[in-house]
């Protein structure tokens, strides 16, 4: 942008004709209209530069743009400069360990170098010929995820869960594991959520070592925030800023990238606000008529290419728990897997509190994961489902009233439930237990041994918060002795 400002003769200058909240109308000379999605610079009275993005062109040499920050102090007649490019954000190693806003400006009081690479936030999705077509499992090292609802490399995962069930810790563990096991990096896009949550996440990341304060380039994550106090334009575009940073790591550095979007519903909500401000006719339930297109433009860029992959984990808020609401319904069409966090499991102290029966994945097919993995997962689910059905009888009559066969099912299900828990690396600080990464082969082996009855002699408490099955057996022997 600064380059454009230095070339005086080519400056394309217009003037504000109207300001309505975050919406600005500006008039330019005939034949000099900025393109759609171009960034416009406006200087406010106090000297701050406000960036707006062109949304509509009118036939009287007028454009309508949406501001990325507050428009306080703007008035008619103020100069508007067309930067002749979309919003450009910094990319690459310099972004690691840092916090950015929608415009790629740092908000952590540490300056970023001027020579950094920058890319526009509006880019085409990878072409069909560049896509990686063979489905591959993205191993996370988290037993419950890898066994029952495996993630697809370059796929999209919906993360469902209320407050206080462990979303943040699960997100941080995934960031940690992708860095260690895949040599990858992560980008976190905070879209329209609470500023306090963004601050807490940053502090927890520093505490757990995900962000290395003494050497920022050794950090494993870049953070981009457009929180709920921001104008709708910023909340609508912050997801694209985070995605652009992730694309650079995938396409140029050829890395596997994890992209977190918290919350994808707020992206839709911001788009709905902008749509209303621009005077578009609302669609079902008051959402924008372009809902499907906007969601598709974001989701289609999240994919595996021959260079690397972007695997996206998106927190999904379901308004009024209505899954048929157009916002979550449109999101579901793009998801490959869902990870549902259960308050009931969290109350039992089973972490990660991933619900083994509600979480799903399109990858759990014998052709993709192999018959051993598939059969083990189905048998685990069947055992847990039977245990769930028997819980009412146990609560009323007690376990002694069950048949011998059902008692065996309950015993194995309790072992499975506890074995699905796991100590996390990022939780070491407050649990005191060292974290464990369990590869898929050991995960399948462990659950098979429980299902086959090889471990019936051991107490179920030995399976709680352990890594692989050998650790559980060693713990069980210690308890017995």
Swiss-Prot record:
List the GO molecular function terms. ATP binding; ATP hydrolysis activity; proton-transporting ATP synthase activity, rotational mechanism
Question: What is the membrane topology noted in the UniProt record heading this document?
Answer: Peripheral membrane protein
EC number annotated for this UniProt entry: 7.1.2.2
The record's Gene Ontology cellular component field reads: chloroplast thylakoid membrane; mitochondrion; proton-transporting ATP synthase complex
Q: Where in the cell is it found?
A: Plastid, Chloroplast thylakoid membrane
**Assembly state and interactors?**
F-type ATPases have 2 components, CF(1) - the catalytic core - and CF(0) - the membrane proton channel. CF(1) has five subunits: alpha(3), beta(3), gamma(1), delta(1), epsilon(1). CF(0) has four main subunits: a(1), b(1), b'(1) and c(9-12).
Task: Please describe what this protein does.
Answer: Produces ATP from ADP in the presence of a proton gradient across the membrane. The catalytic sites are hosted primarily by the beta subunits.
Put simply, this protein is called ATP synthase subunit beta, chloroplastic
Q: Which organism is it from?
A: Dictyota dichotoma
Highest lineage ranks of the organism? Eukaryota, Sar, Stramenopiles, Ochrophyta, PX clade
Gene (UniProt): atpB
């Amino acid at each position: 942008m600064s380059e454009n400002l230095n070339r005086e003769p080519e400056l394309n200058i217009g003037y504000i004709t109207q300001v309505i909240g975050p919406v600005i109308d500006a008039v330019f000379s005939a034949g000099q209209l900025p393109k759609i999605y171009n960034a416009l610079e406006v200087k406010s009275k106090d000297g701050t530069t406000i960036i707006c993005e062109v949304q509509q062109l009118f036939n009287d040499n007028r454009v309508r743009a949406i501001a990325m920050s507050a428009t306080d102090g703007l008035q008619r007649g103020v100069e508007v400069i067309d930067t002749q490019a979309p919003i450009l954000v910094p990319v690459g190693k310099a972004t690691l360990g840092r916090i950015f806003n929608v415009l790629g400006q740092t908000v952590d009081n540490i300056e970023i170098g001027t020579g950094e690479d920058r890319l526009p936030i509006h880019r085409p999705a990878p072409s069909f010929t560049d896509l990686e077509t063979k489905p591959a499992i993205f191993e996370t090292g988290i037993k419950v995820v890898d066994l029952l609802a495996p993630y697809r490399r370059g796929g999209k995962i919906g993360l469902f869960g209320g407050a206080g069930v462990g979303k943040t810790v699960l997100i941080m563990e995934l960031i940690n594991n992708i860095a260690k096991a895949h040599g990858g990096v992560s980008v976190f896009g905070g879209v329209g959520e609470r500023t306090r949550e963004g601050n807490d996440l940053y502090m927890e990341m520093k505490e757990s070592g995900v962000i290395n304060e003494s050497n920022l380039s050794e950090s494993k994550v870049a953070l981009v925030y457009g929180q709920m106090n921001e104008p709708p334009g910023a909340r609508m575009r912050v997801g694209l800023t985070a995605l652009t940073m992730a694309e650079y790591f995938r396409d140029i550095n050829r890395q596997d990238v994890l992209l977190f979007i918290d919350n994808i519903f707020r992206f839709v909500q911001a788009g709905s606000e902008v749509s209303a401000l621009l005077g578009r006719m609302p669609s079902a339930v008051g959402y924008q008529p372009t809902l499907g297109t906007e969601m598709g433009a974001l989701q289609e860029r999240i994919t595996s290419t021959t260079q690397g992959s972007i695997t996206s984990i998106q927190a999904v808020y379901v308004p009024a728990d209505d899954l048929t609401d157009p916002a979550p319904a449109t999101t579901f069409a793009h998801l490959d897997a869902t990870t549902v966090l259960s308050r009931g499991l969290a109350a039992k102290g089973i972490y990660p509190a991933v619900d083994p029966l509600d979480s799903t994945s399109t990858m759990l097919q014998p052709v993709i994961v192999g018959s051993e993995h598939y059969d083990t997962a189905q048998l685990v689910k069947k055992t847990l489902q039977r245990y769930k059905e028997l819980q009412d009888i146990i609560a009323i009559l007690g376990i002694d009233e069950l048949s011998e066969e059902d008692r065996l099912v309950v015993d194995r299900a309790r072992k499975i439930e506890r074995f699905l828990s796991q100590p996390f690396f990022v939780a070491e600080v407050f649990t005191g237990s060292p974290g464990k990464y369990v590869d898929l082969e050991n995960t399948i082996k462990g659950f098979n041994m429980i299902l086959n009855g090889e471990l019936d002699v051991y107490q179920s408490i030995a399976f709680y918060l352990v890594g692989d099955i050998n650790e559980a057996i060693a713990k069980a022997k210690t308890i017995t002795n």
